[in-house]
Amino acid sequence: MLFYFLIWFCLFVFSLLEINNLQKEHSFFLFAISTFLLFFLSFVRWETGTDWDGYYEYFNHIFYYFQDSDFEFGFARINEIIKLTFGNYTILLFVFSCIIFFFQTKVILKYSPLPLFSLFFLWSISFANVFYIRQTVAIALLFYSTTFLVNKKTWLFFICIYIATLFHSTSFVFVFAYFLFRLRITVKQMFFFLLMSFLFSIFLVSVFNSILPLVGGIIQHKLETYLALGEDGGGHESIFSG
């Protein structure tokens, strides 16, 4: 965990410099270096992140195209292409890292007045999506889809949501962002909704903890695993492959 704290501390210092009127070219340089290092870390990591074992096992048991799986179409097809072409899991991590960091960085640079602070914020809440799962790929696409809302390109917004569903089926709920974007929400209301969401998430965790004794077998095991990963920051035990 010391390594992760050092990254947090560096981004924190960079953010303070940026807030205190760091020159734009210097800010961009620090942002570019930080983003590249996080991008590099995202695909050279090994045995880290949520559901690592499940995804790695699935990759190693791909033997032909359009193989039956419980994963979404886009995620499954990319896994098949990489496995049957290269047979290397690190290449798969690299491909997904490119997708995530491309869209994530593009939005930050376009809309954030403080890119370094945005990166620091992302690291604080989600390790800047370094330890991603297929849901993270979908979130990156949804994150980028908001640019089409801003530019009033509605059809591209919905196309982007559809592509995101190819990586995680729950992405379709983001269509409600179209209606929320048209609402006039004050800063106070926004903070109120964020606070309510945070309290609701705490409530859900307590509910899950209460019902765990009532469910058995694999369901209980998976719930306990996800709750434990949420408490320790995602289960990032090691970083680099050997």
Where are these regions (language model features)?
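Alpha-helical transmembrane segments and terminal signal-anchor/GPI-anchor hydrophobic tails
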Residues: 48, 53-57, 66-72, 76, ...
